[in-house]
Amino acid sequence: MKKLIFKLSVGITPLALIGLGSFGLAVSGAKPNNLKPVNQVGEMNSQGQSNLLEKARRWRNSNFTSLSIDGTNPGALVLTGSKSISRIDLYGNVIWTFDPGNTNDLTGKVGFYDANNKLTAFSGDVSFNVSDLSSKTVVEATQDQEDPNVFYLLLMPDAAVQQEQKTKDQVFENYFMSDAPAAGDTSAEGSATPAGGGSGSSAAGGGAVAPAAASSTARLVEEGNSAGMGTMTPTASTSETVIDYNSDQNKIPKPKTLLDSSESSESINGGRTYANINTQKNLQGVIVKVNENLFNSENPFAVENMAFIKPKDMVDNYPSTWTQGSANGKMTNVLQFYKHDNPNAVNNRFYRAKYYPKRLETQTTTPLIDSSFSPYEHPEWYEGNQFVMPWMQYITNLGGLYAKDGMVYLFGGNGTWVNNESALSIGVFRTKFENRTAEAPGNTKTVGYPYGILLSAISFDATRNGLALAAPALGQDVGYHFVPRLAVGGVSSPRGANGNIFLGSAITWGTNGGNFLDTKWHSPAVIEDAPTTFITVNSSGVLQNSGSQQSTSTPMPNSNGNESIPYRWTNSYDYNSVRFAALISKPAGGNTKQVESLFTTALKLDTLNSLPNKFTQENNIFFSYAMLDGRQWSLGTRKDSTWLTTNTINNFTYNTQQQLASTAAGENANPRNILNALTTAKGFDRRDIGNVDILYSNNTNKFTYYYQVGGAITTWPEVQVNYKTSANITYYNLTRTDFGSTTPATQDANTVSSKLNGAYLSSTGDQQGWYNGSIYVKKASFTPSSQGYTWQDFKGLTTTASNAVISNWTKAGYSIRPDDDTVFSVSKIPFEKEITAAVNVRSLDSYYVQLNGETSVNTVARVSPDSSALTLNPKRITNPLMNRDNVIGQGAFISRNDIPSSFFENKINDIVTTEADGTEVLDSKYINSIYRYTPPQNNPHIRLRLLVIDRSRATNDFIKLLPQVLVDGEYVAVPQANSVFVSDQEFTGFDALPGYVLPVAISIPIIIIALALALGLGIGIPMSQNRKMLKQGFAISNKKVDILTTAVGSVFKQIINRTSVTNIKKTPQMLQANKKDGASSPSKPSAPAAKKPTGPTKPSAPGAKPTAPAKPKAPAPTKKIE
């Protein structure tokens, strides 16, 4: 029986195990498949392992300290150390650092991530070597707008970074030798020392190239203005010959000697020639493509590709007129000079120069070198009489980084890395990074596009703009004689801007005949007199006659050497004023050296991506579509030309376009005056244009752009197609007492100058005034900043999640809230200790500043949840993880084995809801089933949601969720507990059957089979055994019966055989005798058998053995087993 039980157990146990295994598979099939959770890497065992940010730094040329990062794990990229850039999360935890000086570490990071997030080296040849980065410094970064895991880093040659110069108040005494003789004075020409600086002239003992010209004035005549003006037409260029620029006849005012010769372009270029830059990688900027993968804790970033930028990439696309040699052999368009010394200056009227140049009119085919954009007047752009891209200009143009889908752009910098007004950006570099393969990183291609061709579509709609004065000198002709150069504050293109790139900058203008002045209406006072009045002066410039009429507009030399000079100027041809269509302006005879006005526009990214690599005259029409709309550009006010002078430069108190449009605005409404009022009047350089930032306006439902201009925050509306040019542009002047100021001073007719922004010496010497090349500021006095602020102290614009914009300076922040402001107020945030950097993190309603001498950061945040005022938290962040938990709490997804199977019995569509803003989130009733969250102590009721960042819609395959909490109106991702990484998690296995269905469906057939087998084994086997035993028993019994029968038969047979026939008769008697003894008849046969000796004894055995058949009953006990 025990053997039978053992056999049954052995038979049933495998079946039971199969059933249990099936049940386990069914249950586990309802659990989530957690694919690639971010929180699985980079976790920290304790909060004490937080990595603090190193010392942050700023690169002024591109206004860069940090980049706010969007995506699954938001935060920032921050310039740190002396050469590096660090990636931090929202709370200051350092995730990784890119150090170009550590090439050994970078070498191991060259490659790509495979499907398993493993860093894999390229199997083929790699065209770059990270060892070339050892001579570079990271100065800027951007995030690819299409792939948030891809960053592009801009690295600059160490040689350029080491040249960064400390800024100073932009006043004359800080830049020029005030006691130098007047270089334009005939008496001083022989002994004058050539100067550098703003003009970039030859240093003492240098070559023969003359210093750049200052600005003699020129009269620009409106076409068909009056009878007097109409008779004044330039002499045909074919009959006139230009004079040598360095001859005694050339009386163009020369710049004064620089106070610091290191600020001259020659010193800055330092022998780094254009040819050397193109061939030596250590002198080139480079863009590095970095791929971030936070699933890989060992290698959180990979160096995927690199592209070196060469100045040749830009020069190769200069228009043909820019690269042609001189046609007249003298590289100038000056024909002659009229010497004049007017003794009858009128007090408070306009500036008049001593020498009046007459210039040859520029034609569309004139080589640029023969206009006033020549090696003499713009030496900073020439090398060996060739218009190229020297070192100073090349480094300046490396800035303004932007990237989308592998197309990377450099829109340029503002040039403030050096104290040279001519350091400006001339165009846009475009680098295409091709897709990588497993074998190679992909090819790169860099081309450059000058702004002269990208902005060639500038035009205006006269019916819409209604210009009161003359259009600005921004128009382009088919010969491309206007050479715009920009001080670029920055660019921005949020995802919602449809690929339109907003450009915030200041821009140079073109001029008439090479002179820096280009107004048609306001010029020296003498020109406002009768248009045909002439004066006569002798060769010394002394007035001989006045008021006499001349029969011709051409000055006539007298026999005594005297010369008649018209009050109206001889340069009567038009200038490059903006026209109603592209490329139909008059050629610009010259180009200003400095930026003249603010300038914003929008460029179309799709067009920039598709532009031909090579610009030619034949395909120039394609480039005219680079602008979103040629009519959509702004100078910060109405599109008029400038007044020649102003006495109200520091009285700029206007905030809006509507205020500037009023008659009370006067000179303040002029675009040139606005730029000067915001910069030079406060001691800033006109190139002091800050970084561009953006906010989404809840009032207008549009983006608003911001950038710093000297001592003011300016706001600009989003530029769109058919956008109204009257859109509001706001100027937020920062606290006036903290910045420098210019005030008018007592003046007389002979001292009508200001030394505030005068880079050039008047031809009449110090007593007659200084002229800066574009706008003349009357006699004034300058008061430096009470805080000692220069552009060096500007640390950048930052924004907060609650739409605050903060201008950060070393000693204070200045905050505005445009969506809430109706009175245009600025709130000051005092910093108890000077700051060295401001770090922008767009996702929080706060930002970070780094105090001087500290390696940690402090928070600038709201005073309280009920207040919009910001304040600096005096406590340094020493534990970023604790700081994070105090703000948003912490959480973690529940282990897969602990999630109830009922969660996966739902369809994805049944557990997802849509919020008012259109985002999909997990239904709140399911959150506790899969996520455990601990809120911050001071905000226990903070709102938590699980954002759907990816899911299958057609099927119920998967859903990916990201935990977020609502902080100050913005949802912020919640990192995994004790980790620097945000955790998004993927779940699969939805629309599963109830937990009991599958186990039951599998178990019931198995149980039935098992029962059947058990019954078959438990009943069938014993029955079979009993039957067999019965058969054996019957066989034995039958055998014994047969034996007995045979024995009995044998006995009877013997008896019969022994009885003879003779005894037959006796037999009845014997039978009868037996019948008489019927009662004892059964026993009687034994008696005779016993008495007989032999024969009768054998039959007796069968007679006793008939009981033997009962023995087969012995197997009967087996029935008890049943």
Swiss-Prot record:
It is found in: Cell membrane. The chain crosses the membrane at residues 997-1021. Belongs to the adhesin P1 family. Residues 195-208 have a biased composition (Gly residues). Could be involved in cytadherence. It is a single-pass type I membrane protein. Keywords: Cell membrane, Cytadherence, Membrane, Signal, Transmembrane, Transmembrane helix. Residues 1-30 form the signal peptide. Residues 1079-1122 have a biased composition (Low complexity). The gene is gapA. This is Adhesin P1. One of its GO terms (biological process) is adhesion of symbiont to microvasculature. Residues 259-273 have a biased composition (Polar residues). The keyword Cell membrane applies. Residues 183-209, 244-273, 544-563, 1066-1122 are annotated as: Disordered. The keyword Coiled coil does not apply. InterPro entries: Adhesin_P1 (IPR022400), P1_N (IPR022116).
